[in-house]
């Protein structure tokens, strides 16, 4: 069972993970050279290699989108398609969510703090990503309802449209792009959030 996420959303998710791990690159500079020639993002190219190795009948491709997952839960969805003999109701699903995507405000704060710390080296920096994750998660005044805004998303969706159509035709039997198109965002990705970063200078220089 293999899950595929629309490429521009995948890039945004990787950006969020990178920030949580201490990365400080700006959103506009993050993976700005990705194109259908990139193996990691071209699902038609990469999945053909899986087909060559295991055979097409052994593959179960799925779209990674909560609205398309069984009961909106990837665990249940995986069980349904990989282990249908397992009763999903016999399992416990109480677990704390991990590595949640950052909101737009959170990402801006992470990027500012991480870039300010960028030149620090040595063991003293090893614990900082974890500390920052805790501090930002507890910080009041952040708007956590708005996802990271990347105005490049529609262009990336369009760039991969042809290869995605071919991918879905071959592996889903549908001659269309089944990925939901991202909306054009109105917010400048580098726009300062509602709070001032200077209000949290203690995070940037501590």
Question: Which role fits each region the language model picked out?
Answer:
Residues 1-206:
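Anion-recognition interface
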């Amino acid at each position: 069972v293999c899950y595929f996420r629309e490429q521009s959303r995948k890039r945004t998710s990787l950006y969020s993970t990178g920030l949580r791990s201490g990365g400080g690159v700006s959103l506009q500079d993050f993976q700005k050279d990705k194109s259908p020639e990139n193996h990691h993002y071209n699902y038609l190219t990469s999945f053909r290699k899986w087909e060559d190795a295991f055979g097409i009948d052994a593959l179960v491709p799925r779209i990674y989108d909560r609205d398309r997952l069984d009961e909106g839960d990837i665990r249940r969805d995986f069980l349904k398609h990989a282990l249908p003999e397992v009763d999903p109701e016999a399992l416990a699903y109480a677990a704390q969510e991990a590595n949640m995507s950052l909101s737009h405000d959170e990402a801006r704060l992470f990027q500012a703090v991480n870039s300010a710390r960028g030149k620090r080296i040595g063991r003293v920096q090893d614990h900082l990503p974890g500390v920052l994750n805790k501090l930002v998660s507890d910080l009041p005044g952040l708007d956590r309802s708005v996802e990271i805004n990347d105005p490049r998303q529609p262009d990336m969706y369009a760039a991969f449209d042809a290869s995605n159509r071919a991918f879905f035709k071959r592996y889903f039997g549908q001659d269309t792009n089944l990925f939901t198109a991202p909306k054009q965002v109105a917010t400048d990705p580098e726009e300062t959030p509602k709070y001032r970063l200077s209000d949290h200078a203690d995070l940037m220089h501590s």
